[in-house]
UniProtKB/Swiss-Prot annotation:
Entry similarity comment: Belongs to the tobamoviruses movement protein family.
Pfam families, per database record: MP
Compositional bias annotation for Basic residues: 368-379
Name of the protein in its database record: Putative movement protein
Gene Ontology MF annotations: serine-type endopeptidase activity
């Protein structure tokens, strides 16, 4: 991986879309006032993800993965220009916004990586630490590499993993908003106009975010850090509503119009209704579980096993050469765990563990104490072939198609549009999907009672 270098400084847009502050002329050399961005096949998109407390496991610790571009946008480009074969990732912005008071003591880490790689060292693109005491943190970087539109891993060619610490919110609230913007360019055969032909992953700008090395996370070896990626989960979704409106630019619209595309996404079946907050009741989970492949170390060509929490990670590193012992599931055959809250199920699990004489604890005060079951992960593609609806991930998408360079402009105006795919137009709750063979009790706590003993590896 190329060494990260300091690139062009830009002013991060406050209260707007950070990716809109990135000049296309910073990345490409053929930008001209006489050429439209649409003619150059340059697109600006932004996704907005809501992170719910059910997506955050005990002690305010949670790691989630976010693909950057929905396949529906790729299909739209292919319909307009069938000869298009590749997409170049020009710039990427990641904004993490706190939906709570300032100076609450919430911080975290963010990784940008290419999930198509098998090794962590080659997959890593960018990593930084952020602090939400000021309410928001943003990093803008340039991945600067192309991907084939026929690649089954297109949606995962740039993924963002965000880990929060000390985020102790109650169930069914929205404490965090993650905005991921990208500037990409579609092309046919070869893109010779890229200015930086040597480096990838160079930093453009940062606000309340500090780029970090591996040592800053308390790990000594890269292959140990790669274990962290076995926590990652992705949420396959479908577009349920599409809107498009135009915003006049300049005086009386003399500067033209800015086209805004808005996508709303949902996970699970189309008939799933929006859930209202109801403390003590857990949200039903989709059964379409899938696992994200883990990374292998370049030194040890073996696949890393799935771990539940950071304590599992530490225990695994200490005992990686020793015997692996399984943890018995506390959900016995014939027991009913439906229609109870996650906390009630946790207490029932702890009581069952005491009766069975189990030595494992699910949670303890002052730390994340959960022991996981190691297991191999299945390789599953998250992108479908051309002509089929792919895997879209997100809650909201805004696209810019402006003549020339795009700068930070306010986005406002009435909302109006139409439905697609026949789904409900109301926003829907994103559901986390399975992340591999995890500890059974930890799965039940996070994902609900449908994760039964058949999720445990057959060897145990």
């Amino acid at each position: 991986m190329a060494t990260m270098i300091r690139g062009h400084r830009l002013r991060i847009a406050e209260g707007d879309i950070p990716i809109a502050g990135v000049k296309s002329s910073r990345i490409y050399s053929d930008i001209s006032p006489f050429k439209k961005a649409s003619d150059l096949m340059i697109h600006w998109n932004e996704f907005v993800f809501k992170v719910m407390p059910e997506d955050i496991a005990g002690d305010g610790f949670r790691l989630a993965s976010i693909p950057v571009i929905p396949s529906s946008e790729v299909q739209a480009v292919l319909r307009k220009r069938e000869s298009t074969n590749y997409v170049h990732w020009g710039a990427l912005s990641i904004s993490i916004d706190a939906l709570f008071r300032k100076n609450a003591g919430v911080s975290g880490w963010c990784y940008v990586y290419d999930n198509r790689w098998e090794t962590f060292e080659q997959a890593m693109l960018q990593k930084f630490h952020f602090n939400l005491d000021s309410g928001s943190a943003t990093l803008v970087t340039s991945p600067n590499f192309p991907v084939s539109l026929d690649d089954p891993g297109l949606s995962n060619s740039i993924s963002v993993a965000v880990m929060f610490e000390n985020l102790n919110f109650k169930f069914e609230s929205y404490p965090i908003s993650v905005r991921v913007g990208n500037m990409c360019r579609f092309f046919d055969s070869f893109l010779s106009s890229v200015k930086n032909k040597v480096d990838s992953n160079f930093l453009l700008e940062a606000s309340n975010a500090d780029p970090l090395g591996v040592g800053a996370f308390g790990f000594e070896q890269d292959d140990q850090v790669s274990e962290l990626f076995n926590y990652i989960q992705t949420v396959p979704t479908q577009a349920i509503k599409f809107r498009e409106h135009e915003i006049p630019k300049g005086f009386l619209g003399m500067m033209g119009k800015k086209k805004i595309k808005s996508f709303e996404f949902a996970s699970g079946s189309k008939g799933m209704e929006r859930r209202k907050p109801n403390r003590g009741k857990q949200i039903d989970r989709s059964f379409s579980q899938r696992a994200v492949p883990g990374f292998r170390s370049q030194n040890e060509k073996v696949e890393h096993q799935g771990l539940s929490t950071d304590s599992d990670f530490e225990n695994f590193l200490r005992n990686k050469r020793g015997n692996k012992a399984g943890v018995k599931s506390t959900a016995s055959e014939g027991s009913s765990v439906d229609n109870i809250s996650s906390r009630e199920f946790q207490f029932a699990r702890q009581n069952q563990a005491k009766e069975d004489g189990s030595s494992s604890e699910f949670a303890a005060q002052g730390g994340r104490k959960s022991k996981g079951i190691s297991g191999r992960r299945k390789q599953t593609s998250s992108w479908k072939d051309r002509g089929n609806p792919g895997t879209d991930t997100g809650v909201h998408l805004r696209e810019h198609s402006d003549p020339g360079n795009v700068r930070a402009d306010g986005v406002s105006g009435p909302s109006g549009g139409s439905e697609i795919n026949g789904g409900s137009i109301s926003p829907r709750v994103l559901q986390p999907e399975g992340s591999g063979q995890l500890d059974q009790s930890f799965q039940d706590y996070l994902f609900g009672p449908e994760h039964q003993q058949n999720d445990i590896p057959s060897g145990l």
